[in-house]
Amino acid sequence: MIRLYADQRFEVGAVVALPPEEMRYLRTVRRGGHEAQLFNRAGQVAEVTIEDNLARIERVDHNPWPLHPLRVAVGLPEPSVVKQLIASLSELGVTELSFFKADRSQASLSRLPSEDKQDRLAVEAARQCERPIPLRVTAVEFESLVDASSVATTVVLDEQPDAGSSPVGSEVNLLVVGPEGGWSARERDAFIQASVPRMHLPTPILRVATAAVAATSWCLAHRSLP
């Protein structure tokens, strides 16, 4: 079924005016019929009947997502990687993707897609993977990540083998992945001084997108264990 996005709450019987970008999408995929699904950022999924640019809400379900909230912070990658990260982490059920400028980042925050573009990418990813709530995408400072980190709720992916393999418990809600060039001594020391657990994956050198997906999968799998 065709899935469309609207940034408002749904009530049965209400009529929603579809945003212009959703109408453009609808015109490219519609193959007859007037039924579709509408989703928003509140976890609501509505069955709707479409007439012109209006959607009449016939039924509303609430689908909480994700089951295991996890925020993933990634050292700023090249702009071309942003779309891939948003799509992949959306499919994995991540709550939030935060980009931060690391000492060895090869790009700057100013080169990130605009907030509007990031939002459209998150909506498109949610549409494709049938995720009710689009991924939240933010930009943060490295220092704020350290301040938000704790022994119990944070895991840092580290390319150095001596980081070991920290156990991931169900209470972990923040995964921090370094930039393409790896952590600087200053950044690594900041996490060590804060006693934040570090985790090393025994693999060859990973690109930042691969590292983020692999570490996220590891965390989600271990969060699900009894």
What residue ranges belong to the model's regions?
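Short amphipathic alpha-helical segments
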Residues: I86, R111, V168-G169, E187-A190, ...
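N-terminal positively charged helical leader segments and presequences
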Residues: M1-N63
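Active-site/ligand-binding-proximal alpha/beta "capping" segment
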Residues: A148-A190, V196-L201
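Glycine- and other small-residue-rich loops at beta-strand/loop junctions that grip anionic moieties
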Residues: V74-G75, E180, P204, V208
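RNA substrate-binding interface of SAM-dependent RNA methyltransferases
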Residues: H62-V155
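Fold-independent oxyanion-binding glycine-rich loops
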Residues: Q8, P20-E21, R41-A42, L76, ...
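Structured adenosyl-cofactor binding patch, chiefly the S-adenosyl-L-methionine
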Residues: A185-P226
